[in-house]
Curated annotation (Swiss-Prot):
Group of enzyme by EC: transferase
Upper taxonomic lineage: Bacteria, Pseudomonadati, Pseudomonadota, Alphaproteobacteria, Rickettsiales
HAMAP family associated with the record: RNApol_bact_RpoZ
UniProt superkingdom: Bacteria
Annotated GO biological process: DNA-templated transcription
Catalyzed reactions: RNA(n) + a ribonucleoside 5'-triphosphate = RNA(n+1) + diphosphate
Its biological purpose: Promotes RNA polymerase assembly. Latches the N- and C-terminal regions of the beta' subunit thereby facilitating its interaction with the beta and alpha subunits.
Name the UniProt record assigns to this protein: DNA-directed RNA polymerase subunit omega
Cellular component aspect of the GO annotation: DNA-directed RNA polymerase complex
NCBIfam families attached to this UniProt entry: rpoZ (TIGR00690)
Keyword Transferase: yes
Length: 127
């Protein structure tokens, strides 16, 4: 399989690294797309072999495959900026259910604690 098919593919795609990337992409497309009629005829071969054979036979459009690969690698999720202030106000309203937290200045939980002063000496807090 590999040597003869790869040598045939080198006539169409001379760079072996590029060939590997494009053949891998086409093999993945064969796995995920519905091409069961053609794959049933070539059932004994796996998708990578089928993709190499189709590339060697010229049945695959290499520029189209390259464009498909580039499109698959692009990130399609871009952050959209807020258009108006009403949307940001809606976010603030969603957090109204949170309870308010009171932070007091009562240090009673620190009673009976041992602290170190600036001189490095231990001292206990007095009430």
């Amino acid at each position: 399989m590999a040597r003869i098919t790869a040598e045939d593919c080198n006539k169409i795609i001379p760079d072996r690294f590029r060939l590997v990337v494009l053949a891998t992409r086409y093999a993945k497309l064969l796995n995920y797309k519905v091409e069961t009629n053609q794959i049933k005829k070539e059932k004994r071969d796996k998708p990578p072999v089928i993709s190499l054979r189709r590339i060697a036979a010229g049945k695959v459009s290499v520029p189209q495959l390259e464009q498909d690969l580039i499109n698959s690698l692009r990130t399609s999720s871009m952050i959209e900026p807020l258009v108006n202030q009403d949307e940001s106000e809606d976010v603030e309203e969603k957090f109204e259910y949170l309870p308010e937290v009171y932070i007091g200045e009562d240090y009673s939980d620190l009673d009976d604690q041992i602290f170190i002063n600036e001189n490095g000496e231990d001292y206990e807090t007095d009430k």
